[in-house]
Amino acid sequence: MKVVLIGDSIRMGYQPIVIKKLPAVDVWGPVQNCRHSVWAHDRCKEWVIDEEPDLVHVNFGIHDSVLLPDGEHQILLPQYRLSVRRFISKVRDDAKAKMIWATTTPLYASDPDLPMAQWPIKDVSRISDYNAAALEIVQSEGVPVNDLHDVIVRNDFTKCLQEDGCHMTDFGNEVLSDAVAEAIEGQMR
């Protein structure tokens, strides 16, 4: 079975551990950060279709929900909804692969005056809005959900998140890799 992992820097943190946990599975992911939904959709042929996967595990949303320093949204919620729908269609129609959708992990601002992950302005509550929008779509499409947001919350997000309030500690990557490996194994049955 071939699995492609698509996602931002959060995926890049757990990917090497998932590969070690699933030695009988051909797990691959792009070397680069897949950033946001529009970026991933535009590179779907290179990152997904050309790899001919049986299963795609998708994890993006942080970059989509970012408020840029000028106060503009990186990807507005209506555009995000459209990108999620288009990505699902492209994977199903062109790659003929099954998919798992992973919710976006939480953000945490221990000091609201400090920048998070190099972005000076980020509203941590926006993750919930983007997760809700994606869940409405993927559930209506019958795509299984891997709730990585809940995994981090249940495992004490202050232990899972680095000081930047976005990226994972070693412990955070470990718990995410467990959840991703389990979700993949669940689709292999």
Predicted regions and their residues:
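Histidine-centered active-site loop/cap adjacent to the catalytic His
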Residues: 40, 44, 132, 144, ...
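A short helix->loop->beta-strand "cap" motif at the edges of active sites that frequently abuts
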Residues: 93-99, 143
